[in-house]
């Protein structure tokens, strides 16, 4: 039996109609209604992503906004979320049903289909659009799923109905780390006369260094353990973060027989430490999960033969040029890689890892709120006052932001069962 939903004429949404936080507001807008090839979904949970800060501060100048006039066509923000279909367009009713739960990959590799006239130069030459940018986002009570999302294969079903909304909403940021680690390519050769073979991912039995123990760095740690390196070294200047790393991942690392060590580069030399712990062979994989030029440049000093350097933490425009030791790259056959976001496959894999229990999003969630708190939460993220992910429930009203150490399926069920 097809589920029935009552859809209101208006909804609350976080809207950007210019450049800067003074142009960001929560307001009521008309609830979108889907055309024949579109769907409407209820937003069950949404994440507060750091990328929204850049969007707010750049407005129409952001590279994914393509010059839209935001005063005429405001954006609804929110690139992370979990949704339930509530209305399905006539052309899609044999494929989709109201009540089904999904997540949306926000990076949509497709040319604009809707409103090409709003894009710079009529949308010519544009091959990528994005949810939270020119496509409506998750920081609203409902979200329109347009043709672009479906054509690009960016609507992913939840593999397990028991998966909490908040955890499903975390699939996008986690998928970024999944994608990044899959960009690590290593060459193997059993002997000098054997043909080389290539494999992706971190080196099993090797030494992995993760620089930065913030929320994205911690996601990398959790995923890195699944590759079974011999040792994971986590570096950060903030002792509280290093203590948290040991608390969150120490038991799992021990269970997997993976060494887990933390290091404060403000107190001693990271290069010397890594070289000592690797028997002076250097690290096989280094992930830079901070936006710091020095961290990138210093990594050349402790990468080993055939090592991979992943530039996960981006640098600001104007500060993006770094100096590399080209002799180290040349003589040690070092690979330098990077990635920006994930693909639909990365989201699907992430959801599978969640469903199987191989990764646990609960430990990464530290703030809970509703749409009324979205702007405050975003400002807190900008001010680095939140060490973890913030989740918003658009259909749950609560008086204040809730600080948590973790957020489990039971926590979510209890929270959604009551108001206030």
Task: Describe each region flagged by the PLM.
Residues 2-9, 188, 247, 272, ...:
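C-terminal hydrophobic helical "lid"/dimerization subdomain
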Residues 67, 109-202, 207:
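NAD(P)H dinucleotide-binding glycine-rich loop of Rossmann-like/cofactor-binding domains
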Residues 30-47, 61-115, 159:
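Glycine-rich beta-strand-centered segment in the early N-terminal region that forms part
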Residues 176, 216, 224:
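Hydrophobic/small residue at the entry helix of a nucleotide-binding pocket
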Residues 237-238, 315, 342:
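Residues in the short beta-alpha loop(s) of Rossmann-like NAD(P)-binding domains
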Residues 307-308:
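Glycine-centered, small-residue-biased loops immediately flanking beta-strands
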Residues 313-332:
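Rossmann-fold NAD(P)-binding glycine/threonine-rich loop
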Residues 204-206, 210-213, 221, 225-295, ...:
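Adenosine-nucleotide cofactor-binding segment
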């Amino acid at each position: 039996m097809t589920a029935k939903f009552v859809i209101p004429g208006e909804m609350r949404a976080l809207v950007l109609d210019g450049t800067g936080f003074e142009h960001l507001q929560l307001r009521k807008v008309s609830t979108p209604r889907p055309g024949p090839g579109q769907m409407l979904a209820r937003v069950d949970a949404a994440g507060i992503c750091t990328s929204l800060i850049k969007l707010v501060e750049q407005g129409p100048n952001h590279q994914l906004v393509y010059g839209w006039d935001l005063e005429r066509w405001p954006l609804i923000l929110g690139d992370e979320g979990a949704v339930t279909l509530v209305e399905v367009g006539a052309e899609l009713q044999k494929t989709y049903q109201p009540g089904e739960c999904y997540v949306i990959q926000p990076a949509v590799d497709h040319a604009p289909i809707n409103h090409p006239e709003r894009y710079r130069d009529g949308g010519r030459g544009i091959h990528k659009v994005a949810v939270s940018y020119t496509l409506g986002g998750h920081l609203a009570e409902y979200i329109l799923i347009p043709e672009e999302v479906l054509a690009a294969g960016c609507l992913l079903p939840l593999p397990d109905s028991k998966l909490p909304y908040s955890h499903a909403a975390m699939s996008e940021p986690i998928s970024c780390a999944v994608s990044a680690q899959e960009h690590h390519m290593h060459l193997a050769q059993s002997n000098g006369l054997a043909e080389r073979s290539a494999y992706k991912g971190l080196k099993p039995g090797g030494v992995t260094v993760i620089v930065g123990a913030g929320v994205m760095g911690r996601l990398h740690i959790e995923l890195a353990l699944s590759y079974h390196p011999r040792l994971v070294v986590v570096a950060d200047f903030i002792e509280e973060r290093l203590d948290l790393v040991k608390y969150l991942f120490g038991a799992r690392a021990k269970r997997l027989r993976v060494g887990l060590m933390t290091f404060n580069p403000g107190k001693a030399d990271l290069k010397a430490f890594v070289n000592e712990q690797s028997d002076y062979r250097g690290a096989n994989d280094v992930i830079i999960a901070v936006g710091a030029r020095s961290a990138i440049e210093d990594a050349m000093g402790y990468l080993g033969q055939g090592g991979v350097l992943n530039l996960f933490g981006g640098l600001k425009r104007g500060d993006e040029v770094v100096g590399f030791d080209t002799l180290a790259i040349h003589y040690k056959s070092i690979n330098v890689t990077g990635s920006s976001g994930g693909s639909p496959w990365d989201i699907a894999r992430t959801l599978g890892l969640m469903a199987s229990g191989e990764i646990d999003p609960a430990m990464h969630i530290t703030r809970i709120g509703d749409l009324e708190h979205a702007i405050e939460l975003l400002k807190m993220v900008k001010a680095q006052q939140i060490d973890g992910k913030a989740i918003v429930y658009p259909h749950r009203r609560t008086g204040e932001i809730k600080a948590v150490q973790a957020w489990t399926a039971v926590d979510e069920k209890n929270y959604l069962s009551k108001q206030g």
